[in-house]
Amino acid sequence: MSEKATEIANLLGPTVESLGLELLGVEYLPAPGGATLRLYIDVPLAEQPDRIINVDDCERVSREVSAQLDVEDPISGNYTLEVSSPGVDRPLFTLDQFARHVGESAKIVLKLAQDGRRRFQGQIVRIDTEAAAVVFSVDGKDVQIGFDNIDKARILPDWVALGLAPQKPNKPGPKKPGHDKKKPSNEPAAGKPRAE
């Protein structure tokens, strides 16, 4: 998270927790016409998977943090507040969140290039707490990336495990009218003499 996003997360985290929810992270996206402030919330880990975030949870958090933001005023200028569940491609904001998803695949964008690249996709292998780093398996080899160098990270959903993988049809679908391929015949077209 950016410094501004971290500042806002520290400010709003206790408010979200007072509602019985967890603030996973904050995205602060400044823009000339007005910034976007996006909060990702979830139910506490102890309540998963029995309970999931719903629209009512997002509305409650939005009302409470809107009032707090009006009083504290950490953002100068206009902004749009968005409160969202993390979704199946959940963003990862902390080392603890990476640790919860060891064994899953993720895609990450780095602040500074490592090994000539800024984008990586691979399986989260382990967390190196001493080095404050995440170890990924990328193209068959382990790559250690410092947590401070991770700009953005998201889980890559396993669509097959979720039962949402697109199904390939076993047979071709119905033909559309007018798309029948006719075999050429040696018969001349109606009303036309045969060329010899």
UniProtKB/Swiss-Prot annotation:
GO cellular component: cytosol
Biased composition (Basic residues): 173-182
Keywords (A to Z) from UniProt: Cytoplasm, Ribosome biogenesis
Chain segments carrying region Disordered: 164-196
InterPro entries for this protein: Ribosome_maturation_RimP, RimP_C, RimP_C_sf, RimP_N, RimP_N_sf
Family: Belongs to the RimP family.
Function of the protein: Required for maturation of 30S ribosomal subunits.
Protein name, per record: Ribosome maturation factor RimP
Organism annotation: Xanthomonas campestris pv. campestris (strain ATCC 33913 / DSM 3586 / NCPPB 528 / LMG 568 / P 25)
